[in-house]
Amino acid sequence: MGKVRIRLVKRTARKLLEKYPDLFTGDFEHNKRVVSQLIEYRSKKLRNQIAGYITHLVNMASKRKKAEEASARI
């Protein structure tokens, strides 16, 4: 089974991605630094969870885009 993320992590990650889509990549370390600059959380664990979920969303979007391009070629 996968890990369950709390609603705060998902909501914050989606808002950040919606507001700053060009700042985030598929690299967790990069996203971690960007998240720490954009939001002021005291918890390192929460920052890492948000950055990890953003990384997951970015990677899933890129996989979805590649699959759509491949199906369009066929």
From Swiss-Prot:
Keywords: Ribonucleoprotein, Ribosomal protein. The keyword rRNA-binding does not apply. GO terms for molecular function: structural constituent of ribosome. GO terms for biological process: translation. One of its GO terms (cellular component) is ribosome. SUPFAM superfamilies: Rps17e-like. Pfam families: Ribosomal_S17e. InterPro entries: Ribosomal_eS17 (IPR001210), Ribosomal_eS17_CS (IPR018273), Ribosomal_eS17_sf (IPR036401). PANTHER family: 40S RIBOSOMAL PROTEIN S17. Belongs to the eukaryotic ribosomal protein eS17 family. This is Small ribosomal subunit protein eS17. It comes from Aeropyrum pernix (strain ATCC 700893 / DSM 11879 / JCM 9820 / NBRC 100138 / K1).
